[in-house]
């Protein structure tokens, strides 16, 4: 996660896909900077040169290359982008699911006590389900604990780290948006519709996010906090809910 006074972006905890997206971003920026420098250089040459070629009518070879080179650059950007998009949309078997429901102006999480493990033998009838309402924490209490202003909540959602899971996102009133930048996640919460979102945190962490869709007067006071803990402690947390 990011800290106050940090000079860099926060760490991405999305595993190998996050690293691939980070490398792709660096590649795109390298190409963009190279194109910008070349265009500025050619612009300066054309504007400030004292010479001109009066008999220049057309140059087929030049027109060929200034068409082919941008096409090759775009293809070079397209190929890794499509690969990353494919892996981002890849659906894997989840071991745990939870539902995030946006409400004015807090988040409600619904989940069941089952975690898909080789030793799990609970029947569907014996599985207990729970609901957690997560409101923004009072600022005085946040300051006393040294927390983050407008980002901490009274009840954190807890999830297992390094476990493939699925988040089902919806809304009970107006449009919201469930966004966790450190997990590379942003999905709309739409009334009457459930959006499916694969999720996996590669390490134990506390991930902060916010509603990213203007949803009313208290839109800015609708934080999201998910605490990812080791799987064995997560199982103990689920058992303690009973």
Curated annotation (Swiss-Prot):
Cu cation A2 binds at residues 211, 213, 215, 219. Residues 48-66 are mitochondrial matrix. GO terms for molecular function: copper ion binding; cytochrome-c oxidase activity. Component of the cytochrome c oxidase (complex IV, CIV), a multisubunit enzyme composed of a catalytic core of 3 subunits and several supernumerary subunits. The complex exists as a monomer or a dimer and forms supercomplexes (SCs) in the inner mitochondrial membrane with ubiquinol-cytochrome c oxidoreductase (cytochrome b-c1 complex, complex III, CIII). CDD domains: CcO_II_C. The keyword Cytoplasm does not apply. It is an enzyme of class 7 (translocase). InterPro entries: CcO_II, CcO_II-like_C, CcO_II_C, Copper_CuA, Cupredoxin, Cyt_c_oxidase_su2_TM_dom, Cyt_c_oxidase_su2_TM_sf. Binds a dinuclear copper A center per subunit. It is found in: Mitochondrion inner membrane. Component of the cytochrome c oxidase, the last enzyme in the mitochondrial electron transport chain which drives oxidative phosphorylation. The respiratory chain contains 3 multisubunit complexes succinate dehydrogenase (complex II, CII), ubiquinol-cytochrome c oxidoreductase (cytochrome b-c1 complex, complex III, CIII) and cytochrome c oxidase (complex IV, CIV), that cooperate to transfer electrons derived from NADH and succinate to molecular oxygen, creating an electrochemical gradient over the inner membrane that drives transmembrane transport and the ATP synthase. Residues 1-30, 84-242 are mitochondrial intermembrane. It is a multi-pass membrane protein. It comes from Mytilus edulis. The chain crosses the membrane at residues 31-47, 67-83. Cu cation A1 binds at residues 176, 211, 215, 222. Its cofactor is Cu cation. Mg(2+) binds at residue 213. This is Cytochrome c oxidase subunit 2. Gene3D superfamilies: 1.10.287.90, Cupredoxins - blue copper proteins. Pfam families: COX2, COX2_TM.
């Amino acid at each position: 996660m990011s800290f106050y006074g940090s000079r860099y972006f926060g760490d991405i905890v999305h595993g190998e896909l996050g690293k691939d997206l980070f490398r792709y971003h660096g590649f795109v920026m390298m190409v963009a900077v190279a194109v910008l420098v070349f265009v500025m250089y050619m612009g300066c040459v054309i504007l400030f040169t004292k010479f001109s070629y009066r008999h220049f009518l057309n140059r087929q070879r030049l027109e060929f290359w200034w068409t082919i080179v941008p096409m090759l650059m775009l293809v070079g950007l397209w190929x890794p982008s499509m690969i990353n998009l494919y892996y981002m949309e890849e659906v894997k078997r989840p071991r745990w699911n939870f539902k995030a429901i946006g409400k004015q102006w807090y988040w409600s999480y619904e989940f069941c006590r089952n975690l898909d493990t080789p030793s799990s033998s609970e029947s569907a009838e014996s599985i207990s389900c729970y609901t957690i309402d997560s409101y923004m924490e009072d600022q005085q209490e946040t300051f006393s604990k040294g927390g983050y202003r407008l980002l901490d909540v009274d009840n954190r959602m807890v999830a297992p780290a390094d476990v493939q899971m699925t988040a089902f996102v919806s809304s009970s009133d107006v449009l919201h948006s469930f966004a966790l930048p450190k997990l590379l996640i942003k999905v709309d919460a739409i009334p009457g519709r459930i959006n499916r979102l694969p999720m996996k945190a590669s390490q134990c962490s506390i991930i902060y996010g916010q509603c990213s869709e203007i949803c009313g007067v208290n839109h800015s006071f609708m934080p999201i906090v998910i605490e990812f803990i080791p799987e064995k402690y997560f199982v103990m947390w689920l058992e303690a809910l009973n």
